[in-house]
């Protein structure tokens, strides 16, 4: 649900300070955890902190889970430990049923833990797609702690996704007021303003503040580069920001993919663009958007249909309900393979995945005319696409009007 740097879970209940990244620091940190547990094998706090360390810094998920379980056995009613274990199950194991069970236990143990309430809300939105319950949990979390900038920002993102732009901006304002130097909050607010194509000067000020707060955030630098390239059309400064973003985190797949798009669309440098696409896929091999973007590049720019189809198939396997990827794959099947039956199957799946996406509906209507000669069905689908565009345009008009009133 996040935009810039917002993980699916808003935070950890960990009591300990995270170690620095160098290996020596990690080794010293691990030794400290081990000594604490040797001194008291039933110290739930130490066990939980060690579990977080093993998952986040060592990637040793089996040992991490063992420590989470020991921590919960030592203190079954510790809401912080339960919440961290739920985050682990959702984010690392992908075990959503067990994660939800543990989130509920954590909230029963302490209904006033705003971190757990916010994490559960993000889980409900991102992993369950239950936006109504997610909104209810965010409301509870913010009632408990009205100044939690992470929860306010995550809730703003949910409201933006639901098209409630006025309330979304209210939450972003509150998040910035609560934590004026938080680069993630500032960057997310800037991206929110950018998506509705308004308040250019405010967007730049927010990005400037975000970068001043965290000059090495790859996601924020890339977000600013997107703004400079797509809205300001300042391509030289945009490329400088993309390069800084890649230097800040050479393994951020989203950043690499955005830079690849810039190199393709603006610089027409297809050799470097493909290098960035490949690096993006290597960095995040199950990211549907990255795979789909590389597939589009392979077929539209290089004309390499075999590799393009491989990427489309991987993208659909990674997320079978991504409507845009399904729609693009359908276009590929019709145009490059002339496999109209499979193309129509993909178009239908795309429309089922998002019945109100005017891009998806428009592509399907074009297919019905060009491949099926079915103008009657195409007309109905175009009507739906037009209605979807009208609703979206009206929502954005209202959002821009609200911005001008502020």
Model-derived features: positions:
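Conserved alpha-helical positions within TPR/SEL1-like repeat arrays
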Residues: 17-21, 45-56, 80-91, 115-126, ...
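Residue-level detector of the short coil/turn that links helix A to helix B
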Residues: 24, 58-59, 93-94, 128-129, ...
